[in-house]
Amino acid sequence: MASIQVYLDNWFVRHVGSLKTAIRVVFGVVWAIDGALKFQPGVADSLPQMVSDAGQGQPGWLQPWFGFWSQTVSANPGFFTTTIGLLELSVALALLFGFMRKIAYTGGVFLSLVIWSVPEGFGGPYGPSSTDIGTGIIYAFVFLLLMVINATFGPSRWSLDYAIERRWAAWTRIAEIRSAHSSGDSGGSHAEEALV
């Protein structure tokens, strides 16, 4: 049994480069599906009711938040549905192609939190029938995990950012979460890239 564990541990270590890329790409597919679903017929018509329903049963101190968003979304639901769909598709493309990852991950955290706090109603209201806290907060944590992976392992050679960085080094400021280890070492980061 111990040899199986050692084999699996070694497999993960040997394939860390492709695994971190696979996580990013699969997450991009999830965001692409989310974004595409926003363009289905009837979604814009149902958004105001979804936001209104999210406010039902929430604590009194949250009612102004949901009241504001319910009124705002009701004024032009098509605009909000299209905007959210386009933002989700933009995040999806950035994840799929590994483009502007630092900006995409940061924007993804904020977009996920907006989705979690408005149409998902912070995952609540919480009571005996509650089964989860909503997907938006989990998405935000995945984006934070991708930031940690990028800071820990550096550039991903299976990304559009990597190709751009090879021609234009300044792109690193847009694309990479720089760790203290890689920012102080001018040549070490490219040597580490070869391993990943």
Question: How would you label these PLM feature ranges?
Answer:
Residues M1-L87, F97-V196:
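Extended, low-polarity transmembrane helix blocks
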